[in-house]
Amino acid sequence: MKMFRRRKEGKTNYRKRLALLKSKKPRIVVRKSNKYMRVQFALYETNGDRIVTSSISSELKKYGWNNSFSNTPSAYLTGYIAGKKALKKGIKEGILDIGLHAPRKGARVFAALKGVADAGIDVPYGEDVIPSDARIYGKHIDESLASKVEEVKKKIEEEYG
């Protein structure tokens, strides 16, 4: 039996990918590393996926964010930026693609999804997997972080409208 290279390397689950592609909606690709979060809007094309817009958590520096780029609030804000960029490009809906990440309740990938949804993109999701507002606004880290999240969100809103 022939096995695809990316499957052998443990990088792609083709069964999940096919299910996402059948929806014919733009995929909201959320990837996390130890330092950053990345949110991309990808469209399927026969010669390879086309990334319509992309956002990485290090962009938050531009809006005055000086905290970690890999925590739950920064994941939410990165999703919010990506959602606003996608709206500017004419994308109004999408479907979440978390790749090989395990879908755990309250995970950072779902915080990014909440940011995309709050930006105005129509995305199907269950409320039970989204982190609580206290975690999204960083109250579990520091009480003053909630005001910083609101401040950054306001700056993003000013830039993207």
Q: What do these predicted regions represent?
A:
Residues M1-G161:
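Ribosome-associated RNA-binding proteins
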